Swiss-Prot record:
Function: Chaperone involved in the maturation of iron-sulfur cluster-containing proteins. Has a low intrinsic ATPase activity which is markedly stimulated by HscB. Involved in the maturation of IscU.
PANTHER family in alphabetical order: HEAT SHOCK PROTEIN 70KDA (PTHR19375)
Protein name in the entry: Chaperone protein HscA
Family: Belongs to the heat shock protein 70 family.
A molecular function (GO) term: ATP hydrolysis activity
Amino acid sequence: MALLQISEPGLSAAPHQRRLAAGIDLGTTNSLVATVRSGQAETLPDHEGRHLLPSVVHYQQQGHTVGYAARDNAAQDTANTISSVKRMMGRSLADIQARYPHLPYRFKASVNGLPMIDTSAGLLNPVRVSADILKALAARASESLSGELDGVVITVPAYFDDAQRQGTKDAARLAGLHVLRLLNEPTAAAIAYGLDSGKEGVIAVYDLGGGTFDISILRLSRGVFEVLATGGDSALGGDDFDHLLADYIREQAGIADRSDNRVQRELLDAAIAAKIALSDADTVRVNVAGWQGEITREQFNDLISALVKRTLLACRRALKDAGVEPQDVLEVVMVGGSTRVPLVRERVGEFFGRTPLTAIDPDKVVAIGAAIQADILVGNKPDSEMLLLDVIPLSLGLETMGGLVEKVIPRNTTIPVARAQDFTTFKDGQTAMSIHVMQGERELVQDCRSLARFALRGIPPLPAGGAHIRVTFQVDADGLLSVTAMEKSTGVEASIQVKPSYGLTDGEIASMIKDSMSFAEQDVKARMLAEQKVEAARVLESLTGALTADAALLSAAERQCIDDAAAHLSAVAQGDDVDAIEQAIKNVDKQTQEFAARRMDQSVRRALKGHSVDEV
């Protein structure tokens, strides 16, 4: 009998055949694609030897161009040349226009408030534009590797929310790519440096790209990459340096008109060129719109100093979350082209007390790490023992009675992760339960962020507390959340995948974390009060049902005592005295003990009625 050949689902039937995989750094300003060849990770250049691909797409009626050719058209055809589209991913049109009021594009809102860009090629959304960039990178990889890609790992900022991550996945699928995984950019850098240098200990990854800033505190130990804490700002990067310098040049040149898109582009191009030159020189000559002048590195440093300080404040918060001090950090990895700015390297070095690592090209390190991870995930390194653990930035939980938040997965828990908790019904005969998914660090619903709501129906009508509902939170490797609620006796269940239409800003995330610390004592007191009020309501509801059913078991005097105790509890439960509510609950319990005993005796007699002692 011949053997039946089998293989793992999704893997090649020829187990020793090398599969083609790539890592893609889908950046705000520039993008790269990398792969592993002969055991070495390397970025793939275009025909002219250029490794970076400008994240720019120029649209025309007859087609589109991506990269350098598109960027060269920016000044002549600004409205049809889309750049920094990553900043628009997962955001509403209102949010984009509030954040970036000077974007030179013709926007229209879709039916759900998401942005559509009106171009010569028609209405396009950020997902489509990102897909065109990904197609160009995939084509470069396929040509270089002489074959179609079996899978890719695409990097995203650590603080990208669910909508932004899902948008990135959608763009990849639109580009015809099989996504092996989305990988946080700082984590990709840790993979690149961890495998190359073999360092063990705490590492800070300072990632300042064109449009985003991320700081990650990682522990590297024996091949395990664990993210201890993350922080950052998804709306801060080298683009902001460029715009500040462009505005400064505008002022020096006396250019008041902001409506001329061609001049806007010339100013921005001049600012970018000056920024790059000032990384090596102390002064640079600028010639734009008929104006000539000189800009010094000191002037540039003054312009960007506040932004650099903002990144260091995020570093301090991340270190606090990780429970480490700056001196505990073994290495500081610099990622992103903007880390070439001398002031950035200087301030980061001063903050951590050590010279930052720049051994791997900061523009390429993320793509290289992604390529290494893709090579493993596609099955080319079955003997690899590398383990990668990312974290969620904010706690996830549920609303419970009294407006309280029950945390199911705490902040900075490594992902992928699944956690479950059991809940029960509050009222007799309750047949449905509303599941309200929350995100945040505070104790009360009003102080946290609502992620989603759904209902579980078909719960059997049992006494309060009789039904058992298991709620499971599952966060996958891409940071996407699924919540499932199941009634255990019947198996009836409902679920939801959380995909916010647009996300939470990193400033709000930092504020939520800060508030949880500032209001910790106040929140604990508020929670204790809410819990006592919920317990008071439960006791009173239960007592009302018991009195309705078995009031005949009480004398008039006993009934009066119970009614008085219940009235007192109802009154104090309206106030804010936790101790008074607790004492009133105890008093009701004391006054109803004999009543409860009689009800129990009566239930036993009813159960035994018509049965002999032998049957019992």
